[in-house]
């Protein structure tokens, strides 16, 4: 299970600026419900919300606090498309079916927007996202994708910016050009997650914190999920723990399909008027390298800058300085700026970077492998699973058809493979 010492949120800029929110109770006694969801991040909550809104009984068990993992620590980018790119989807299912997947990715972003509006979630939601190209070959790849997206996916909202046009919006000389997406955007991930949790609870879902799953066993009516001092009997089981997928033997098979990649984020001091000159249209930015930088401004004018793979570096101060050096490559004018917050976390990726969710058994569902696109895709994953539980698996089935190669499961070799893979792609990015 999650390290038992991790009962509370780990320090981060997001935790320090979290909206007032309740502490949900620890599960006591034995309860019975239609669906039990293990995991109180966005995967689980975005499954619980539509179930509860449709009058379905649902319990969510969170081992630590709501949004404790990636949902409350990420860069906050809400992005259409998939991390694998539409080329991988096309290769697997063909262009016509890939167009359906494309529409799902667009709907994922709009689902975030509509839920923020419907439930009045205060999470600094801001439209605008740019993919930037560091090297000439990256710019060529970006232009090719832009043309393909226009021709086959009707992506007329995309704008292609050359170096001069990009410079009008971004105070950096590092990039060759960019593709701007006015529909994608960024938000405060912890506050968004807390808002979805409140919406689910208001709709009737029962949420429990500090209630780690310790054991699962079949019972007459479905499944019995144990926590340290209690249990939940349920018909349907949803395993929504992402990077913690291998924590229970029954779900060890999921560990073969996704691996946790570490990432690190720093937050500067408030930049005041300098922030407006840094990113003039307040968009989120990510480059299109394999080992990439991602950054954006916070609502109070800080630069939040993330990247790196800290798999073999356990010193937070060292990681802070490494990411700061990457920030200064993009914005050397920030050399005098203090770093006030730094934190790390894990992102689960599949081998081909396509999302991985579906069923392990008729009443056992899972979601993982968003590969950096989880702020948006969790909404569609949760909706697809909820719809399937309620009898309509039309949205879930196509995602189940996506093929995923196995990843080695031995812990040290997973870490080593992740590290060596990162180094290989860093080399590839620079050549």
Where do the model's predicted regions map?
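Extreme N-terminal leader/targeting segments of oxidoreductases
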Residues: 1-35, 53
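Flavin (FAD/FMN) cofactor-binding and adjacent substrate-gating region
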Residues: 2-17, 84-90, 114-195
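N-terminal Rossmann-like FAD-binding beta1-loop-alpha1 element of flavoenzymes
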Residues: 31-60
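Glycine-rich FAD pyrophosphate-binding loop
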Residues: 53-73
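Glycine-rich active-site loop/strand segments that organize a redox cofactor
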Residues: 74-103
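Active-site substrate-recognition segment that forms the wall
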Residues: 110, 119-126, 213-215, 230-273, ...
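Helical element adjacent to the flavin cofactor pocket in flavoenzyme catalytic cores
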Residues: 140, 147-148, 173-235
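C-terminal catalytic lobe of FAD-dependent flavoproteins
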Residues: 313-316, 320-430
């Amino acid at each position: 299970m999650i390290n038992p010492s991790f009962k509370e949120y780990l320090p981060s800029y997001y935790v320090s600026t979290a909206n007032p929110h309740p502490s949900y109770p620890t599960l006591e006694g034995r309860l019975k419900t239609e669906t039990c969801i293990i995991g109180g991040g966005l995967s689980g909550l975005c499954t619980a919300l539509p179930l509860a809104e449709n009058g379905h009984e649902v319990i969510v068990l969170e081992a630590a606090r709501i949004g404790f993992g990636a949902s409350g620590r990420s860069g906050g980018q809400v992005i259409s498309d998939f991390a694998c790119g539409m080329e991988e989807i096309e290769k697997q299912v063909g262009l016509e079916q890939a167009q359906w997947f494309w529409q799902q990715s667009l709907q994922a972003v709009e689902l975030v927007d509509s839920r923020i509006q419907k439930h009045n979630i205060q999470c600094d939601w801001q439209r605008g996202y740019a993919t930037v190209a560091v090297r000439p070959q990256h710019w060529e790849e970006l232009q090719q994708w832009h043309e393909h997206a226009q021709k086959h996916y009707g992506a007329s909202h995309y704008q292609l910016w050359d170096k001069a046009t990009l410079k009008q919006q971004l105070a950096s000389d590092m990039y060759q050009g960019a593709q701007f997406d006015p529909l994608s955007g960024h938000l405060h991930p912890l506050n968004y997650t807390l808002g979805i949790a409140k919406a689910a609870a208001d709709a009737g879902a029962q949420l429990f914190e500090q209630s780690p799953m310790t054991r699962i066993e079949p019972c007459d009516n479905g499944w019995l999920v144990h926590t340290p001092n209690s249990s939940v009997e349920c018909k349907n089981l949803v395993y929504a723990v992402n990077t913690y997928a291998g924590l229970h033997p029954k779900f060890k098979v999921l560990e073969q399909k996704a691996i946790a990649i570490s990432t690190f984020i720093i937050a500067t001091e408030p930049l005041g008027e300098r922030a407006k000159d840094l990113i003039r249209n307040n968009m989120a930015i990510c480059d299109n390298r394999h080992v990439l930088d991602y950054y954006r401004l916070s609502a109070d004018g800080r630069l939040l800058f993330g990247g790196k793979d800290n798999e073999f570096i356990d010193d937070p101060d060292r990681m802070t300085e490494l990411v700061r050096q990457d920030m200064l490559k993009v914005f050397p004018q920030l050399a005098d700026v203090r770093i006030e917050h730094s934190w790390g976390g894990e992102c689960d990726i599949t081998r081909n970077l396509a999302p991985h969710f579906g069923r392990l058994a008729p009443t056992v569902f899972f979601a993982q492998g968003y590969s950096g696109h989880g702020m948006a895709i969790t909404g569609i994953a949760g909706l697809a699973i909820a719809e399937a539980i309620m009898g309509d698996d039309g949205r879930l089935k196509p995602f189940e058809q996506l093929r995923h190669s196995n990843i080695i499961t031995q812990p040290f070799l997973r870490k080593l493979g992740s590290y060596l893979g990162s180094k290989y792609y860093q080399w590839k990015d620079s050549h």
